[in-house]
UniProtKB/Swiss-Prot annotation:
It is found in: Cytoplasm. This is L-carnitine dehydrogenase. Its EC number is 1.1.1.108. InterPro entries: 3-OHacyl-CoA_DH_NAD-bd, 3HC_DH_C, 6-PGluconate_DH-like_C_sf, 6PGD_dom2, L-carnitine_dehydrogenase, NAD(P)-bd_dom_sf. It catalyses: carnitine + NAD(+) = 3-dehydrocarnitine + NADH + H(+). Catalyzes the NAD(+)-dependent oxidation of L-carnitine to 3-dehydrocarnitine. Pfam families: 3HCDH, 3HCDH_N.
Amino acid sequence: MPFITEIKTFAALGSGVIGSGWVARALAHGLDVVAWDPAPGAEQALRKRVANAWPALEKQGLAPGASQDRLKFVATIEECVRNADFIQESAPERLDLKLDLHAKISAAAKPDAIIGSSTSGLLPSEFYESSTHPERCVVGHPFNPVYLLPLVEIVGGSRTSPEAIEAAKTIYTALGMRPLHVRKEVPGFIADRLLEALWREALHLVNDGVATTGEIDDAIRFGAGLRWSFMGTFLTYTLAGGDAGMRHFMSQFGPALKLPWTYLPAPELTDKLIDDVVSGTSEQQGERSIAALERYRDDTLLAVLEAVKSSKASHGLSFSD
């Protein structure tokens, strides 16, 4: 069955931080958006989040016809998905909830509409088990803020068709995203597994009194983080090998991997560790509100994205290279 890839109506189920990010991105790309969330006050909170994201999206550039007025909030799942060309679910990470939700979504949706889930911790084969037409169901795992960061990890379940993966790539690309197909259905996918390893080490460093949260963040943002934003890990280490490249790097520094520098198990989240982390991040935040920090993050991300795009273009590369 051919799947819909030219999207006019985008359905969003769940309107928290991630769901509202999808809504803002879809609206900015000139789509009609139908949203549903059963939580009290959800519509008001969603419209506020979209309004907060809009200045950054205006700076990035809106598609013709893009408007916050093209958002419609509805009372039922069926009304949300019935006429949608694409569906993105961003509900809480509970298997029982997602099983029930996707049974209802898939029963009411067009049979050729791709259904994506924003899950970061559940596997698609599990929560799409009771879905109608499971061959069109994928994970589309984004990163916050969804309306600015381009990466989306696409994961298929045991019954997802290859055609659905390709259709999802096309849809997410049209939304200005950089789709990354995760070849195997594994917990944590790709990016979160890397981030969790770094997070565990950071917690150990705080717990052992080696560094404060601010010092750890400085180690990233003034060091490797700058390189990671445009080269990633492997290409960075290729340069560390000199003219001989990665093979020399592996032979020279590979044995260091066996040194007992790092921990694999996470530290126990004691009250003291939690207090130390909260105290440290509160000091970093200072008098700035969360809203002010979000504006700072968005403006800086826009500048970084534009700088990376411009520099790549000068070297004959596209942004996604």
